[in-house]
């Protein structure tokens, strides 16, 4: 699925267009074997999802690869990310597993911006500099990866709750 990097001067930051896939209040989701390219915003954006699996995805360019705000029993496995922003981001996660993924980013591999409980990050590889420039770095076209894993609940806005039961191996 090609998002074509559509720019919208009335969009977020005066440039962002639509997400490639957007789901809200959904359960029992399986996305497998899909290639998501040149997202005009996030490749996958969701609010309040449960029992979701993402397997064997290839995400290239765009902003965030997978951005989940509110998720329970989520599995992200065997995916390859080459993003111009965070590979996986969001928060309010309960029982999320991110396993055997390759993350090449010009921002962060995994960025937690809200609380999470039961997060497991297993056998993932984080590699910079990014293949594609950071989407909002303008003429600078910054490619350096800032962090492999960044746990910063409340960094964007007040986010109440705990970060607990985190495993990184």
Question: How would you label these PLM feature ranges?
Answer:
Residues 1-169:
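Extracellular/periplasmic carbohydrate-active domains that bind, remodel
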């Amino acid at each position: 699925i090609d998002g074509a990097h559509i720019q919208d001067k009335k969009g977020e930051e005066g440039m962002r267009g639509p997400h490639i896939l957007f789901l809200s209040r959904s359960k029992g989701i399986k996305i497998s074997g899909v290639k998501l390219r040149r997202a005009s915003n996030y490749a996958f954006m969701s609010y309040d999802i449960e029992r979701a699996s993402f397997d064997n995805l290839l995400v290239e360019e765009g902003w965030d690869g997978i951005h989940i705000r509110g998720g329970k029993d989520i599995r992200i496995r065997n995916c390859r990310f080459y993003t111009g922003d965070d590979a996986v981001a969001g928060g309010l996660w309960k029982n999320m597993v991110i396993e055997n993924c390759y993350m090449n980013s010009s921002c962060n591999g995994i960025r937690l911006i809200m609380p999470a409980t039961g997060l497991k990050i297993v056998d993932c590889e984080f590699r910079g500099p990014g293949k594609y420039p950071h989407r909002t770095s303008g003429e600078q076209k910054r490619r350096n990866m800032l962090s492999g894993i960044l746990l910063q609940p409340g960094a964007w806005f007040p986010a109440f709750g705990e970060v607990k039961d985190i495993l990184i191996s």
